[in-house]
Design a protein with these regions (language model features):
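Short, charged juxtamembrane terminal tails flanking transmembrane helices
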Residues: 1-3, 137, 342-349
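Alpha-helical transmembrane segments and immediately adjacent membrane-interfacial amphipathic helices
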Residues: 6-30, 40-63, 73-98, 104-132, ...
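FAD-binding core/adjacent interface of flavoenzyme oxidoreductases
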Residues: 33
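Short juxtamembrane and helix-loop transition motifs at transmembrane-helix boundaries
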Residues: 38, 68-71, 216-222
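Glycine-centered signal
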Residues: 69, 125, 139-142
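Membrane-interfacial, low-structure loops and terminal tails that flank and connect transmembrane helices
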Residues: 133-149, 217
């Protein structure tokens, strides 16, 4: 990877993060409005995921260009965890001191975004020995690489993402159990469920990276981890369609469009898991085409947002999903840079 491209792939997630920050801040501060109290904080804190993806990109790229100093393997992933902690804390603060139901929704969703950020930061941590993956892949033997992670470290990394995912799922269930207290708990619980799907998808990414670094990635991993991500994306997408159709005429049904966007983020994550599976100890002619997946999902998010912006001129219920989908499109494009880095790092050319 040449120096210019390495800079570009690190700049992309940072630029996307700041687009979310500025757009979210503009939405929230422009007018004091209920819909903006939901969309503003959510779009703003989606930028946290972009910063965590920057940490992942920087961790891998610095190894590829041979500038990954020992101290950086702690500082860069640590930065991601700090961002995740601040995001979760901000979400809890928002709904903890909520003046109305709008802030209750945005607070819970922001906390869920923080859980995703923590999962992405764990992916950055698991990538601190990424340089071993090409060597292990080229080696026909299946012996454990002693330079890789210990079995305990591998299990801790996978366990962390599992913990964050379970937290998101339990959180979603608790919110949905409170639907009787108000429709806003349905909205918050549904979106938290979609965020939980993304966290679960990231288990597959962390497990794939950690296992390939240790050279314990087997045929069952090659088959099952990509399936897990695709299932999560399908669950979120279909969940969104069900909400849209089953709640037609209800303002809450527009939440379904956000769920569809979250499903598209899962499909973006699948590009990385599929790439790692396809090129492990074998050649895959279409490996350099896999980065197109997050580009397509980003475009789908933005096109869907455009339709909802138009619909929002006549029905304010579409205000929130239109803005949130723009933020999700930015996250999908961040994932394009990550899968491109992975493709470059694992290429056998």
């Amino acid at each position: 990877m040449n120096h210019g491209i390495s800079i570009l792939f690190r700049v992309i997630p940072v630029v996307m993060a700041f687009i979310c920050f500025f757009l979210g801040g503009f939405i929230f501060l422009y007018v004091d409005d209920g819909a903006r109290q939901v969309a503003g904080p959510v779009v703003f804190f989606l930028g946290a995921i972009g910063l965590a993806l920057f940490a992942t990109a920087a961790t891998i790229i610095r190894q590829l260009i041979h500038k990954f100093h020992t101290v950086l393997k702690y500082i860069i992933p640590g930065f991601g965890y700090v961002v995740a902690f601040l995001t979760i804390a901000s979400g809890i603060w928002i709904f903890g001191f909520a003046e109305n139901s709008n802030f209750i929704v945005s607070g819970h969703v922001v906390a869920g975004v923080g859980l995703i950020t923590a999962c992405v930061s764990t992916a950055a941590t698991s990538s601190t020995k990424f340089y071993l993956i090409p060597a292990n892949s080229a080696n026909a033997a299946n012996e454990v690489n002693k330079e890789g992670f210990s079995a305990m470290t591998q299990n801790v990394l996978i366990g962390l993402t599992l913990l964050f995912s379970l937290t998101a799922w339990v959180w979603a269930i608790v919110l949905l159990s409170r639907i009787g207290e108000g429709a806003y708990f349905l909205v918050a619980g549904t979106v938290m469920g979609g965020l939980a799907c993304i966290c679960t998808s990231l288990i597959a990414l962390v497990a794939s990276i950690a296992k390939q670094i240790r050279n314990t990635y087997g045929e069952s991993d090659r088959k099952n981890w990509p399936k897990l991500v695709l299932v999560m994306g399908t669950v979120a997408f279909i969940w969104g369609l069900v909400v849209i159709l089953a709640m037609a005429g209800n303002v809450a049904n527009t939440t379904g469009f956000i769920m569809m966007g979250l499903g598209l983020v899962c499909f973006s994550i699948s590009s990385k898991v599929i790439l790692l599976a396809k090129v492990w100890k074998q050649s895959f002619a279409l490996a350099n085409r896999i980065p197109l997946i997050p580009v397509l999902t980003a475009l789908l998010c933005l096109f869907l947002a455009a339709f909802l912006f138009e619909e929002g001129l006549y029905d304010n219920a579409f205000f929130v999903p239109a803005r949130v989908l723009v933020g999700l499109g930015a996250i999908c494009f961040c994932l394009f840079s990550i899968v491109s880095i992975l493709e470059s790092g694992t290429s056998k050319k």
